[in-house]
Amino acid sequence: MIQGFKELASVCQAIATGQQSVLLRKAGIRETTSESGFATKSFYLLPTHYHEKDAKGPTADFQISVRVDVLRSGDLLDWSKVEKLLPLTAYDPKTIREHFDSRDEKLLHFALIQPFSLSPTWNLPHSPSLSGCRSWFDLPPPPPNLSETPVPATEAVRQTALLLS
């Protein structure tokens, strides 16, 4: 099964350019904490905007330019460790703090990733099955002409790996 994960467009861009190599998430509204980790080891990133349901007008198609492999995943239980990671990401620190504190169990799930740039960009039409505040989606097969190139590691990627080791 081919999986897609909705992520902020700014984060997708940082990953595509090698400036970020970690994904952070909390449990979704309909998920328990134990269900919300990164069980899928390879998936496409669907760029989105925070709470897209508030957007006016038709929802744009997904421009998918990155697939990722999860190298390691786990839980971050210590806010000080999350704080050290934040400068190496495109996430908004205030929003991440709210996510960390949003449940009785204070934690964020992380996935250390190896991203792959896609060429050409996969234009996935928006549909009702891809709507809503869910994070994970089943996707149709990608176009047959899609090629992948590993995104080279940067100093930010190396620092992130050290912080998560």
Residue positions per predicted region:
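Structured alpha/beta reader/binder surfaces that contact nucleic acids or chromatin modification marks
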Residues: 1-165
